[in-house]
Amino acid sequence: MVDFKTYFELLNLYSDYAMVCDSANWEKWPDFFIETGTYRLQPRENFEQGLPLCLLALESKAMIRDRVYGVKETMYHDPYYQRHIVGTPRVLSVERDADGERITAEASYAVIRTKYDGDSTIFNAGYYRDVIVRTPEGLKLKSRLCVYDSEMIPNSVIYPI
């Protein structure tokens, strides 16, 4: 599958992604994606039935940057902290071709949300289904599909999952 060095890079990609989201360092979020990278948030029921409807579908790094602008400048909401708990990634496949190495991996996640004046609750849980490619800057997401378990989300999704 993958050698230890590559797997260690994969672990760092997942943990660094979670830390950027948890520290609200939104400007760094797009850096995890290649220019044509996609980010989608989809209910498990739709995914398992092959239905394309997503709660959120960002089709390029430019759209991901626009989302960052929205989070920082235009969206009004009760502020909250979030904490990602991400399982160890499981490598599903590795392909090598003229464009380089492409890893398909998945990892379970839970996002805990804490309102400044309230309790901590599980906001979203599911798994990431990722396609990761090697670039001169290291491993980057070609696509991140967040498949969440519940059909309903208790409130709007503001921050990245």
Swiss-Prot record:
It catalyses: salicylate + NADH + O2 + H(+) = 2,5-dihydroxybenzoate + NAD(+) + H2O. It comes from the Bacteria. Its EC number is 1.14.13.172. GO terms for cellular component: catalytic complex. Disruption phenotype: Cells lacking this gene are not able to convert salicylate to gentisate. InterPro entries: NTF2-like_dom_sf, Rng_hydr_dOase-bsu, SnoaL-like. GO terms for biological process: salicylic acid catabolic process. Pfam families: SnoaL_4. Pathway: Aromatic compound metabolism; naphthalene degradation. Keywords: Aromatic hydrocarbons catabolism, Monooxygenase, NAD, Oxidoreductase, Plasmid. One of its GO terms (molecular function) is salicylate 5-hydroxylase activity. The salicylate 5-hydroxylase (S5H) multicomponent enzyme system is composed of an electron transfer component and an oxygenase component. The electron transfer component is comprised of a ferredoxin reductase (NagAa) and a ferredoxin (NagAb), and the oxygenase component is formed by a large subunit (NagG) and a small subunit (NagH). Belongs to the bacterial ring-hydroxylating dioxygenase beta subunit family. Oxygenase component of the salicylate 5-hydroxylase (S5H) multicomponent enzyme system which catalyzes the 5-hydroxylation of salicylate to gentisate. Active only on substrates with a ring-substituted carboxylate group with an adjacent hydroxyl group. Primarily active against salicylate and substituted salicylates, but not against 2-hydroxycinnamate, 3-hydroxycinnamate, 2-hydroxyphenylacetate, 3-hydroxyphenylacetate, 2-hydroxybenzophenone, 1-hydroxy-2-naphthoate, 4-methoxysalicylate or 2-hydroxyacetophenone. This is Salicylate 5-hydroxylase, small oxygenase component. It comes from Ralstonia sp.
